[in-house]
């Protein structure tokens, strides 16, 4: 009897019409992206169906950022619609070269849903006629200067990547986009409104984008600024973890070391640090583990010391030790634990070892002194001001500083680069907020039931 019933069910199911596939009931006729830099990015789609189209929802994510955003297109339901969703770039800034992956989810009146295949779009500054050079590691864009100018910057960037791999054991994970703006005004028009007028460039580490002002007659600056910011991006990607950043002195010190700034005449970093050492005015590594000073002279000292400490680690402990240190940080270690595992010293011990190597007076470690455990993870940005000469001698002077910039990029210029929180705006994630509300409601209900 059971066998007969099962057979009847199978026969009836075969006789019933098969449910319509979404691809049959909803058809995408056309889709694409239109954009104008610093104004908008508009995603367009044309759809038809057997039933009225009720909903067209765009999902998009900026490569390098963790959140996926959602946008609902507005239209009047019909069996054929043309609609779009616009990202306002006057408010939600993205740097040039940002890569966006996106897809649509279309729903009709019958509840059928179609998800389009994910596509990729690179957001460009369309106001310039870019020349390009590229390989699997880098894409260089410039519009002022001849081929030799572009070749020089591209070769320097590739040498920097080779040096980072040799000296720190780190490889670039994805292609980095480098934009060379031919004037300071053009650069300022390309970056977020919060940038300072002295900014010479920015590195958007999470986006994998560098933007720098290098005119054809200022190639010397470009040959330093490009490696500096490129180092920030590579190191950030290599040590990225959900627990915290690497110490500020290590991050900036690697950028100074890899760019060759320690031996650039207009920086004068070695003479500067020697002068501060003679005056017993060196900063402690504990101080340099977090934010750098806002004062320009002190900021330059911070960059110079950081670069020399990184040089000391590589020369004294070895390249393998530096590679091990970065790997430990990538796993989410605290500052002192990472240093002790890789070098056998904590922050205070490393500080005094380096001071001894330059014949500087040791520091007395305060009783109960501690080093910041680790910095909060951040979307970072570095800033480079325009080149200035740095005086050396008895009274150290500093070049233009790279102060902390609010909410987005990192900057570069022949002055120190500074890190900031927010390498780009995070896209909204409504679902996370709803989950948080649900958790709070659950606990409140539970406590009320228990009479708490």
Regions found by a protein language model. Name each.
Residues 1-6:
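Bacterial N-terminal signal peptides that target proteins for export
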Residues 50, 145, 183-184, 261-263:
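Solvent-exposed coil/turn segments that connect beta secondary-structure elements
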Residues 333-336, 418-424, 438, 443:
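C-terminal soluble interaction/assembly domains
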Residues 431-452:
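C-terminal membrane-anchoring or membrane-association module
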